[in-house]
């Protein structure tokens, strides 16, 4: 059974186009409120948002929808997605709601939900909400309508939580750190976290105007961070995305480190302290060099589908703690219930401080394999899955690469494209194999 509205990370789209319209969002909140009231007489919902101008409108629609179903609302204001997850759990709320489209431009927005435990909701819950949306609204009577209040110190509570995950015997004194907030939800919080731990902070991407979120800054545009680190002779650079659940880091030389490398560092740091790490979870896109390096240390490596939701599901199924993907979504389940860019950055800085080594030194054992990614546009109705030529070229590439590379073919979820990715120790070999497979799709 397919969901009509929910995707892999809530409901997302262009503001003013279905389903991101105020009337639909009001109906959505009303339906969610009715679902909550089936198991709880007087639920309380927390609502946080990023800095998009449309957040005001959607916040009002959510508030009205929940109140109309007899649900109380607590408004958190601009707050990172992981901050909403944390406060939902800490405040013993029934549900957390985030208004954000993450790394997308300002014209997009979305709604995602967290359970009372601070976890993303499962498919069954989403199916129940969509089924309730099909029903006629059942408005609460006047005496049962929900109320709304603000939690004025939401940001401060989350700042203290982030700092609590950093070793108390360590400090960031003496470090100059550039922090790029993507003009998003962490624009005030991120600089404060590192400043209060002792660092000299240079903030960029921390002046939102409602329209500039992720615009040339943040984790999806890391060149701004690289330039600022080099210009200010900083020790580190930290870039978040619009809702601060994603991380990219830069060292003093301007070298960019992606999520694959951060995952290896997080695992290796724990191994160096004598902790047992039976396994970790990456995705289909995680660089093979990370898998090889971790297996050499006796750490099992498992690939999930792309998306932090699927990484989390695999971690919970296996009882493991650490996972992540190259885009910068990192999970450390003994620190937080969801991916958190700030906490991930603190874990990296903690590893550097404990070892008295730089990022490059800590990652010297991992040399990422070159990757070639080719997007091939599919013809209308093209049956690529049953193409004999594609199957033959894919098999030939797999034989040629052996244990020194891999090939991944997957369809885009949003465009008529087939993505052909080849990874190998040799860049030219990766390119040649990818071209042959892509040509088979085009033929």
Curated annotation (Swiss-Prot):
CDD domains: GlmM (cd05802)
Catalytic activity entry: alpha-D-glucosamine 1-phosphate = D-glucosamine 6-phosphate
Binding site for Mg(2+): 102, 241, 243, 245
Cofactor annotation: Mg(2+)
UniProt keyword list: Isomerase, Magnesium, Metal-binding, Phosphoprotein
Chain segments annotated as transmembrane: none
GO CC annotation: cytosol
Processing and modification events after translation: Activated by phosphorylation.
EC number: 5.4.2.10
Any one GO molecular function term: phosphoglucosamine mutase activity
Active site (record annotation): 102
Top EC category: isomerase
GO biological process, one term: UDP-N-acetylglucosamine biosynthetic process
Sites bearing Phosphoserine, chain numbering: 102
Details of cofactor binding: Binds 1 Mg(2+) ion per subunit.
Domain of life from the UniProt record: Bacteria
Similarity comment: Belongs to the phosphohexose mutase family.
Task performed by this protein: Catalyzes the conversion of glucosamine-6-phosphate to glucosamine-1-phosphate.
Name this polypeptide is given: Phosphoglucosamine mutase
Organism: Polaromonas naphthalenivorans (strain CJ2)
Gene: glmM
């Amino acid at each position: 059974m397919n969901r009509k509205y929910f995707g892999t990370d809530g409901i997302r789209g262009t503001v003013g186009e279905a389903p991101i319209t105020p009337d639909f969002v009001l109906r959505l909140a009303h339906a969610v409120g009715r679902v909550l009231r089936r198991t709880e007489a007087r639920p309380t919902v927390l609502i946080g948002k990023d800095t998009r101008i449309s957040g005001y409108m959607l916040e009002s629609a959510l508030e009205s929808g929940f109140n109309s179903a007899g649900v109380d609302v607590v408004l958190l204001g601009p707050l990172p997605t992981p901050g909403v997850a944390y406060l939902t759990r800490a405040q013993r709320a029934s549900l957390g709601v985030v208004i954000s489209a993450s790394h997308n431009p300002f014209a997009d927005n979305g709604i995602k939900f967290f359970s009372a435990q601070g976890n993303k909701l499962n498919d069954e819950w989403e199916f129940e909400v969509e089924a309730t949306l099909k029903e006629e609204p059942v408005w609460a009577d006047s005496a049962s309508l929900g109320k709304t209040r603000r939690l004025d110190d939401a940001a401060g509570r989350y700042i203290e939580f982030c700092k609590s995950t950093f070793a108390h015997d360590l400090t960031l004194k003496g470090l100059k750190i550039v922090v790029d907030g993507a003009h998003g939800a962490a624009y005030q919080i991120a600089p404060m976290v590192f400043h209060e731990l002792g660092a000299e902070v240079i903030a960029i991407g921390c002046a939102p105007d409602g329209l500039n979120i992720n615009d040339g800054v943040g984790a999806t545009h890391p060149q701004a961070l690289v330039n600022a680190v080099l210009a200010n002779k900083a020790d580190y650079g930290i870039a978040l995305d619009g809702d601060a659940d994603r991380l990219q880091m830069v060292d003093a030389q301007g070298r960019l480190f992606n999520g694959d490398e951060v995952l290896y560092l997080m695992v290796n740091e724990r191994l160096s302290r004598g902790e047992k790490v039976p396994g970790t979870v990456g995705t289909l896109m995680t660089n093979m060099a990370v898998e090889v390096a971790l297996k050499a240390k006796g750490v099992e490596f498992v690939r999930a589908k792309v998306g932090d939701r699927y990484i989390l599901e695999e971690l919970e199924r296996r009882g493991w703690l650490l996972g992540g993907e190259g885009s910068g979504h990192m999970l450390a389940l003994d620190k937080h219930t969801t991916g958190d860019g700030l906490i991930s950055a603190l874990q990296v800085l903690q590893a550097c401080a404990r070892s008295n080594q730089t990022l490059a030194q800590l990652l010297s054992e991992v040399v990422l394999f070159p990757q070639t990614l080719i997007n091939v546009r599919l013809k209308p109705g093209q049956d690529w899955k049953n193409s004999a030529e594609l199957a033959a070229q894919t098999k030939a590439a797999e034989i040629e690469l052996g244990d020194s590379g891999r090939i991944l073919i997957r369809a885009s979820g949003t465009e008529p494209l087939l993505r052909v990715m080849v990874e190998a120790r040799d860049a030219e070999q990766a390119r040649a194999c990818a071209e042959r497979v892509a040509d088979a799709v085009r033929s």
